[in-house]
């Protein structure tokens, strides 16, 4: 099968400055995703989409191909769908069976995870169009509700003091791996639904670098033997 990996990496960040290339244990954050993709030896192309020449240089240094974004896709209003649509419709010079989206903020997602996800997807590719990596949710959905403008808890109408987990588990996307057939994704514009498979990852490997606390935890995990 013909497959590509896409790693989106816009420059700047509202939280951590230049988050996608911030140093994590001696390597820029994006390097972890590039190296994991290349180590699988499963992709025809490993592509970094960026608006920054500096990011492009780093990506190429670690072995990725680069697609520079146009001005319309270089601001914080550009969605993931818009970036992927541009690549799939306008930039790709060949047909593919599917693509794998790897967010650069998941440094503990390894080549083993990617390979397992691909194997699972391909084993059921006749019946599914998407795959999304998931983790067990920290809180069941019944425990998560908005707080009203008047700061009351009127949306929390369960007796939480007597709450016990039900027999089923709740899961949430961890942002590490998304797989899709191009036509299905362009039509649906997201990765979820009845035609999407799940790939479960543990909490440790699911860490997503969004703020300084996430970065510190990732450093601790990388430098330790915590499983």
Can you say where each PLM-predicted feature lies in the sequence?
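Short phosphate-binding loop-to-helix
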Residues: 47, 53-100, 109-119
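Conserved core of the sugar-phosphate nucleotidyltransferase
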Residues: 82, 107-195, 201
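A short, N-terminal amphipathic alpha-helix
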Residues: 29-45, 62
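N-terminal nucleotide-binding beta1-loop-alpha1 segment
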Residues: 1-17
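Hydrophobic targeting segments
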Residues: 2-7, 30, 45-48
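Conserved acidic residues
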Residues: 3, 44, 97, 129-131
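Conserved SAM-binding loop
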Residues: 22-23, 48, 101, 207
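Hydrophobic helical membrane-anchoring modules
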Residues: 198-200, 204-227
């Amino acid at each position: 099968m013909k497959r590509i990996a896409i790693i989106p990496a816009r420059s700047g960040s509202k939280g951590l400055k230049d988050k996608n290339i911030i140093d994590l244990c001696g390597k820029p954050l994006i390097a972890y995703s590039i190296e994991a993709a290349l180590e699988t030896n499963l992709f025809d192309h490993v592509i970094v989409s960026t608006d920054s020449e500096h990011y492009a240089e780093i990506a190429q240094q670690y072995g990725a191909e680069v697609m520079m974004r146009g001005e319309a896709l270089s601001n914080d209003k550009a969605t993931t769908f818009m970036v992927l649509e541009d690549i799939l419709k306008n930039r790709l010079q060949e047909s593919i069976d599917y693509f794998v989206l790897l967010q650069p903020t998941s440094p503990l997602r390894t080549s083993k995870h990617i390979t397992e996800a691909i194997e699972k997807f391909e084993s059921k590719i006749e019946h599914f169009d998407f795959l999304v990596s998931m983790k067990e949710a920290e809180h069941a959905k019944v425990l998560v509700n908005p707080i009203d403008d008047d700061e009351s808890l009127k949306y929390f109408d369960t007796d939480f003091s007597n709450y016990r987990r039900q027999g089923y588990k709740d899961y949430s996307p961890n942002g590490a791996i998304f797989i899709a057939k191009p036509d299905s994704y362009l039509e649906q514009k997201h990765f979820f639904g009845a035609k999407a498979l799940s790939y479960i990852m543990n909490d440790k490997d699911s860490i997503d670098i969004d703020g300084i606390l996430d970065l510190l935890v990732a450093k601790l995990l990388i430098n330790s033997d915590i499983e």
